[in-house]
Regions:
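Short, polar/acidic, helix-capping and beta-turn segments at strand->helix junctions
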Residues: 2-126
Length: 126
């Protein structure tokens, strides 16, 4: 298997022993992104919507570094620390992700790294 490690300074560096993304053939597996500002390495605002937008912005930067974009997504997995924010996350995703929408799972979790309220990961096909 041939795999290429994808990395970009336009998204936060990994905060653990993993890559921002791994590309094999035409498939790209993007690690989860939270609402970290790549410049400050801090969570943006305290606002849920700002975190969701930043997480998708970070994911888009990694997608572009792989040669694609969020339009190439075939699957998203969303992680929320509060499932009561499900509708809000949906509305933001509908604004930032082009149609037709990919497959998706949404998972409620007890906590996320750095106190984030939202995380998103993706699989792309280029």
């Amino acid at each position: 298997m041939n795999k290429e490690i994808i990395s970009t300074p336009n998204a936060p560096a990994a905060i653990g022993p993993y890559s921002q993304a791994v590309k094999t053939g035409l498939v790209v597996f993007l690690s989860g992104q939270i609402g970290l500002d790549p410049a400050t390495k801090e969570i943006v605002g305290g606002d849920f919507a700002a975190q969701v937008r930043q997480a998708f912005k970070n994911l888009e930067a990694v997608a572009r570094a792989s040669g694609g974009s969020l339009a190439n997504a075939v699957k998203f997995t969303l992680f929320l620390t509060d499932l009561a924010r499900f509708t809000e996350a949906n509305a933001i995703m509908a604004e930032v992700v082009p149609q037709p929408f990919p497959a998706r799972s949404t998972i409620g979790v007890a906590s996320l790294p750095r106190g984030a309220q939202f995380e998103v990961e993706a699989i792309l096909v280029l």
